[in-house]
Amino acid sequence: MHIRQSLAEIKNSFHPAFWVANGMELFERLAYYGQQIVFMVYLRNRLGFTETEAGTLSGIFGGLIYLLPILGGTLADKWGFRRAFNIAFSILGLGYFLIGSLGMSAFAGIYGGLSLYWLLMAFLVFTAFGGSFIKPSVLGTVAVASTEKNKSFGFAIYYWLVNAGAMIGPTIAYFVRDSFGNEFVYLVSSVSCFAMLAVNLVLYKEVKSEKTGATESLGKKIANLFVVLGNFKFMIFLLIYSLYWIIFWQEFIIVPYYITDYIGKEAPYEIVQSWAGAGAIILFQIPINRLTKNIPTRTAILIGFAVSSFIWIIIGIHPSIPTIAAGIVAFAIGEMIQAPRYYEYISEIAPPGQQGLFQGYAFLPIAIARFVGDPIGGWLYHSAKLAGDPSRVWWSLIGIGVFGTLCMATYNKYVAIFEAKQAIRGA
């Protein structure tokens, strides 16, 4: 009875739109991570692209997914979140279907004679445009549908549901891929998004913000981009931090290829990645946060960076399902140590009065990592496979991780020196 009462209190403490938006986010992430985990294998084994070509296409798609929300948020604010959700889920539902249709025999006659590469490129860019409205609309709803008292808890619920989707989506993808084929994973993602379109139309009600003020124009957003780019210390930090995400996304680039080619074609790489990664975060995020909360922000980021970088040694020594799973769990521990502190550090580094502006570019390192890292991952694997030495990919990732860790340590050292000098001058 006490548990039921507590759950009811939590439910009633938020506006109904909060739960609708987060429920839609769960299914959107389910759709995204479900298709992302099979993306590289689908492009190579079904559509006939090389690993290098697949990496390039993945980089464009993933890069746009994380870059466009910077501008998509402006349109979402202007249109209202309900309308933005309608547009987003309509485009995502159609986009995922089109991507999957390229591998379906039923559509072979329609696409015959067309350049598969450029056709897929068009479908990916179209789908990424739809995805650009999701995060701003969900995070915007969380912000306006919660109070100052429960807002922190509201974002914790959002983060937990994102990881739940990241675990459930690839799990479903495995069973669909095993029974029907990779192309039908995109059909599941499409159905999931169209279902959320229906949910949005029926259940989502716009929440009016208590804060009043003019919505930033698209021109103002672009001008703000140059303000952020002009902050040298912030940009150096973001560029170094992007090295972390380059390594992370190899779980979706290199790991599926390696398991498929060298461990077993039917091996459940989807479950290995999702349960070891997102599953670990769901279970251990809160206790790890409590254990590391007193570590200085930059130190916590460095520790998380180092842990996530060096774990590839576990895989490199003896690549197998158990060691890959163990490596991904260890990587997730590193992520849990540093990820929450990353946003905290952005608030610290931002000039007074510009914290919100700088937080708006928090996803920029992921966009950089996808644009750069996905093609690198595809090329690395392709080259190692041709050379008959697939294990070199793990040592290459270790090299990137060590380099990134050293860069972050150097950054921390010089920032500490700079801050000490500033303190002396101000004394």
Where is each model-derived feature located?
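Juxtamembrane intracellular "pre-TM" segments in multi-pass secondary transporters
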Residues: 2-15, 210-239
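Short amphipathic helix-loop junctions that connect adjacent transmembrane helices
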Residues: 37-53, 253-271
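C-terminal ends and interior cores of transmembrane alpha-helices
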Residues: 90-115, 306-319
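A membrane-interface helix-boundary motif in multi-pass transporters
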Residues: 114-117, 175-192, 379-402
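Multi-pass alpha-helical transporter architecture, strongest
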Residues: 194-207, 395-427
